[in-house]
Amino acid sequence: MIKNPKVLILTAHYGNGHVQVAKTLEQTFRQKGIKDVIVCDLFGESHPVITDITKYLYLKSYTIGKELYRLFYYGVEKIYDKKIASWYANFGRKRLKLLLQAEKPDIVINTFPIIAVPELKKQTGISIPVYNVLTDFCVHKIWIHREVDRYFVATDHVKKVMVDIGVPAEQIVETGIPIRSSFELKINPDIIYNKYQLCKNKKILLIVAGAHGVLGSVKELCQSFMSVPDLQVVVVCGKNEALKQDLVGVQETNPDALKVFGYVENIDELFRVTSCMITKPGGITLSEAAALQVPVILYKPVPGQENENAMYFERKGAAVVIRDDSEVFAKTEALLQDDMKLLQMKEAMKSIYRPEPADHIVDTILAENHVEPNHIPIKSPALAQSFT
């Protein structure tokens, strides 16, 4: 039994999803009385220059590098066992050894496919439990290593794929992907309509444009949607200040039809009142949409995990996938006018959702390490406190 375990969560800043999952798990551990939790961007700390370059190339995959990313993602999948594993296993190894020596963690969790820890276990025989928390609705071989003790995955489909690859079924737990706790609260939506000046009697289209310009032609799209009767368009620009300023001018022509926001801290509030959402198919965003049963229109998924995510949600009937700019307006307008289709998509989202994934993961890890959680009450956000 470990009395006061130290938990090390390894992650990486490729998109916000991996880090967000790490922070959600950290918060969940702390809520259960586990105070000694460290979150580390291993690659960023080990090789900052290489990491910055690869992050830049990752973002460019949304615009000019799709074929390059396709070759990388699917090519590495094919040759991983033979050529890539030995190189990748040593990436971040020096920093990792120093970190393990200094912090002496009892538990290691990966929210990014970092195999340096299980490879170190294999080579040195160190005894430390390693857990991989997969952050998409698919699996790449780079996540898999014999020295990983347990995998937490989004769906039974992912589990089946992993079993087919050769991972023992008993090592895989279907939990869903950890999401922010705010997405799992029960909140009366009336105050949300007032807060964002939205109308309960109109359809609401949420466009999550993102900070990196990954959603094209947003201005033109907004102008087109503003002509649709009984529709309000809400655009979240994130930290893309240039896009926000560009759209503010459009908003001024009809402030009731278009609402423009920068970074929205409590974006779950907008999820709760939207009729459907245009977004990119990241694993975390899709998990949050599933939690609140938001039908999604997935915009031009990049080859790789985004495309795999999109195809899964499309097969399940929870998403409409857009692969060409010319389709966005027509397909979105048609969906907004089809209440039966929207209801079916909501039901499909409900079937995908797994409640309280972070709690499930943390409870499983603590139980396997014979740790008794000591729950610490956490105050609910003010909006949730307004309704009981």
From Swiss-Prot:
Molecular function per GO: 1,2-diacylglycerol 3-glucosyltransferase activity
Alphabetically ordered keywords of this record: Carbohydrate metabolism, Cell membrane, Glycosyltransferase, Lipid biosynthesis, Lipid metabolism, Membrane, Transferase
Any one Gene Ontology BP term: lipoteichoic acid biosynthetic process
Catalysed reactions, semicolon-separated: a 1,2-diacyl-3-O-(beta-D-glucopyranosyl)-sn-glycerol + UDP-alpha-D-glucose = a 1,2-diacyl-3-O-(beta-D-Glc-(1->6)-beta-D-Glc)-sn-glycerol + UDP + H(+); a 1,2-diacyl-3-O-(beta-D-Glc-(1->6)-beta-D-Glc)-sn-glycerol + UDP-alpha-D-glucose = a 1,2-diacyl-3-O-(beta-D-Glc-(1->6)-beta-D-Glc-(1->6)-beta-D-Glc)-sn-glycerol + UDP + H(+); a 1,2-diacyl-sn-glycerol + UDP-alpha-D-glucose = a 1,2-diacyl-3-O-(beta-D-glucopyranosyl)-sn-glycerol + UDP + H(+)
UniProt EC number: 2.4.1.315
Protein's pathway: Glycolipid metabolism; diglucosyl-diacylglycerol biosynthesis
One Pfam family from the record: Glyco_tran_28_C
This protein's GO CC annotations: plasma membrane
Subcellular location per the Swiss-Prot or TrEMBL entry: Cell membrane
The family this protein is said to belong to: Belongs to the glycosyltransferase 28 family. UgtP subfamily.
Its job: Processive glucosyltransferase involved in the biosynthesis of both the bilayer- and non-bilayer-forming membrane glucolipids. Is able to successively transfer up to three glucosyl residues to diacylglycerol (DAG), thereby catalyzing the formation of beta-monoglucosyl-DAG (3-O-(beta-D-glucopyranosyl)-1,2-diacyl-sn-glycerol), beta-diglucosyl-DAG (3-O-(beta-D-glucopyranosyl-beta-(1->6)-D-glucopyranosyl)-1,2-diacyl-sn-glycerol) and beta-triglucosyl-DAG (3-O-(beta-D-glucopyranosyl-beta-(1->6)-D-glucopyranosyl-beta-(1->6)-D-glucopyranosyl)-1,2-diacyl-sn-glycerol).
The protein's name: Processive diacylglycerol beta-glucosyltransferase
Gene: ugtP
